[in-house]
Amino acid sequence: MSKTGKYYEIDWREEDLRACIDDDFDGDALAVVEAYFANVAKVAEKKPTILGHFDLIKKINGDGKFFDENNPRYTAAANAALMTAARNRCVLEVNTSAAYRGFRKDYFPSDAILKDWLILSGNVVITADAHDAKALTYGFEEAAAKLKELGYTKVQVLGKDGFIPCAL
């Protein structure tokens, strides 16, 4: 997929995402999105217990700066990765870190992805991806309320004997 063989931090600095789009994908930001979700699907094929950072590609895309998150190419790529995750019985991470760090107001994955996931599986876990103690449970109540609004009735909670469902 990569013309240059470089790896890019697509979730931290806008200039890195821009370089990835321009240098490796000839300016086609949605091709980057498709490559990202293809890699998410490859990870899902490995059957991880939790599939995290599902749509991290959107982290620094506030207000559609690089691509349209509602574009059919975006949604098709995301849905293909979701189908792979469902087939492999992954628990999807709902991650509050981008909101905590001020990159976005919403969480990962997007509402649209979470609606589709509810139909396919519905197994989610809320995480903070905390890098400091203040972030440990940041946004959990809001994320739980959002999930409930989207139709979820439970989340998975990791206990000493594995995951257990917890009512919202």
Set out the residue ranges of the language-model regions.
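Extended substrate/RNA-proximal surfaces in nucleic-acid metabolism proteins
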Residues: 1-87
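Charged catalytic cores and adjacent phosphate/nucleic-acid-binding surfaces used
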Residues: 7, 64-168
